[in-house]
Design a protein with these regions (language model features):
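Short, exposed "boundary/linker" segments that immediately precede the start
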Residues: 1-2
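Terminal RNA-binding accessory module
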Residues: 247-353
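Conserved SAM/AdoMet-binding glycine-rich loop
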Residues: 91-217, 225
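Radical SAM enzyme [4Fe-4S]-AdoMet core and its adjacent flexible, acidic
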Residues: 108-129, 175-179, 239-270
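Short flexible coil/turn linkers enriched for glycine and charged/polar residues
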Residues: 44-48, 58-60, 157, 167, ...
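Proteins enriched for Cys/Gly/acidic motifs involved in redox and nucleic-acid/cofactor modification
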Residues: 6-10, 14-107, 146, 161, ...
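Conserved, mostly hydrophobic/aromatic
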Residues: 62, 82, 99, 135, ...
Length: 353
């Protein structure tokens, strides 16, 4: 192990620390090496689920983000490296694989050898025992037709996309140094819904970015009400020392940030409840994660459908779980829906999904 660590340091880490003002910024860039082959990663997630990091660093340069300063430009793992890790974990019982990077849709383009996220997925779906593959952090800029096609047609790939949009106002997007316009974002979302009608779209939005006007915020609010995202996270802008956004004029007050955040989340709660109530009567497959006891001897299984990501989305609760255990996949019939969670009953006969 010690030899592997030393070898990894020698091969992969370059100290690029520098002085910024009166502070020393510690930045370590890693070459596109394959950490999995050097030291096999041990997931801290449940034994049936794992996160797979397909790249490190980021090349986007958003004005509010410090990641490129400390992690360097994006460096993708090779397809064989990722396939090797997924094969190993699937042989150990992992069934759900969540692919992550700072910008997953850009994956492979830095390698300049034809590698893309779609081509990686084509290899991952061939692996035995892989049940669900879910995609996170898909920036809209590089979300191309090849990627959409494989998401649509491959059964193992969850019909779920996480696209962190941050905002919809063009003036805010420009100050953020985002590469997409409101028009291109809306065009992509329309294409996703038209191509895959049952796709789940999750996004993350920011309120209170420097210079965000009341009109900008109202545009954002109108946007989410029109699109009706299946899942949405939001946060208030927080200045990161040393980033361009921290030096911008027209910083928004904390009070306004909080008010906008709560208004946005309240609107999304109504949208989520409406979306979930539309699922009543639908049959779906659920990954059981936990068995709950109400204290009176009544058990309930807590799990997730393929359209619910771990930790950030809601859950499905199944009454009378019988012999179900964490890690089991079970067919369930949705009987009720709330703002974030669903209630279902187990399907004991083979009705298909």
């Amino acid at each position: 192990l010690h030899k592997a660590i030393r070898r990894q340091r020698q091969m992969c880490i370059r100290d690029r620390s520098y002085i910024h003002g009166n502070k020393k910024i510690y930045r370590f860039d890693t070459a596109p090496c394959e950490h999995e082959e050097l030291i096999p990663r041990q997931p801290l997630t449940p034994p049936y689920s794992a996160y797979i990091k397909i790249a490190e660093g980021c090349s986007n340069g958003c004005t509010f983000c410090y990641i490129p300063y400390v992690r360097g430009a994006m460096r993708s793992r090779s397809i064989p490296s990722v396939v090797h890790e997924v094969k190993r974990l699937s042989s150990e019982g992992v069934r759900e694989f969540n692919l992550i990077a700072q910008d997953s849709s850009f994956y492979g383009r830095d390698l300049n050898d034809g590698t893309t996220l779609a081509r990686l997925l084509k290899e991952l779906v061939k692996i035995d025992n892989v049940k669900w593959i879910r995609l996170f952090y898909l920036y809209p800029t590089y979300f191309d037709d090849e990627l959409l096609e494989i998401i649509t047609k491959e059964e193992k790939i969850c019909k779920y996309v996480d696209i962190p949009l941050q905002h919809i106002s063009d003036s805010v997007l420009r100050r953020m140094h985002r590469r997409d316009s409101s028009q291109s974002i809306k065009k992509l979302l329309k294409k996703l819904r038209n191509t895959t009608p049952y796709i789940t779209i999750r996004t993350t939005l920011m309120v209170g970015f420097p210079g965000e006007t009341e009109a900008d915020f109202k545009e954002l609010l109108t946007f989410i009400k029109a699109v009706k995202f299946d899942n949405m996270g939001a946060f208030t802008y927080s200045a990161q020392d040393g980033t361009p956004a921290a030096r911008m004029v027209d910083q928004v007050t904390e009070e306004i940030k909080e008010n906008r955040y709560h208004e946005l989340m309240a609107a999304q709660a109504e949208i989520s409840e409406e979306n979930n109530r539309n699922l009543i009567g639908v049959d779906t497959e659920v990954l059981v994660e936990e068995l709950l006891d109400d204290g009176c001897g009544n058990l309930q299984a807590k799990g997730r459908a393929s359209f619910q990501a771990p930790e950030v989305d809601g859950n499905v609760y199944i009454d009378h779980p019988g012999d179900l255990r964490p890690g089991d996949f079970v067919k369930a019939h949705i009987i009720d829906g709330y703002a974030y969670d669903l209630i279902a009953e187990r399907i004991t006969t083979d009705r298909g999904i």
